[in-house]
């Protein structure tokens, strides 16, 4: 698989990964995804307003000399959520390190043993497969089955 994907593909993968990743406090100490997802969602809500205010404030005070700087600041503010989604998209397509791949396989096996339907085990899993597996584990396994890992 080609690891170099386009920007639009990375942004789309980041959006899917953001929706797939389980937002559980048990995972926040292990993975940075929860912090990145919260910051990206906050940026999606807040940064367009900050961008508009930075430009409109200069226009309201007739400070047209500062308008180019305000536009640059607005573009930077608008780029912050895109940077978060790009990072998430890139992360979702990154292969798991060996220790996490072993953990993914054990968790996958535990879900299959419990009788839940799950996609086939990947030989070279990526973070997006881990997200799907973790999501399924938190939904279908009881706390006693998850005690070993959390």
Curated annotation (Swiss-Prot):
Belongs to the UPF0208 family. The chain crosses the membrane at residues 42-62, 70-90. GO terms for cellular component: plasma membrane. This is UPF0208 membrane protein VV2132. The keyword Transferase does not apply. It is found in: Cell inner membrane. The keyword Chaperone does not apply. InterPro entries: UPF0208. It is a multi-pass membrane protein. It comes from the Bacteria. Keywords: Cell inner membrane, Cell membrane, Membrane, Transmembrane, Transmembrane helix. Coiled coil: none annotated. It holds the Pfam family DUF412.
């Amino acid at each position: 698989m080609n690891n170099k994907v386009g920007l639009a593909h990375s942004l789309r993968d980041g959006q899917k990964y953001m929706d797939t990743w389980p937002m559980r406090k048990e995972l926040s100490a292990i993975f940075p995804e929860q912090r990145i997802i919260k910051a990206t969602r906050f940026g999606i809500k807040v940064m367009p307003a900050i961008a508009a205010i930075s430009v409109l404030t200069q226009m309201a005070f007739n400070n047209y000399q500062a308008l180019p700087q305000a536009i640059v600041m607005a573009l930077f503010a608008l780029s912050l959520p895109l940077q978060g989604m790009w990072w998430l998209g890139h992360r979702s397509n990154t292969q798991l390190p060996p220790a996490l791949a072993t953990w993914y396989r054990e968790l996958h096996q535990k879900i299959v043993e419990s009788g839940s339907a799950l996609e086939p085990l990947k030989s070279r899993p990526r973070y997006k497969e881990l997200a799907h597996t973790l999501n399924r584990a938190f939904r279908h396994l009881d706390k006693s089955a998850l005690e070993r890992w959390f």
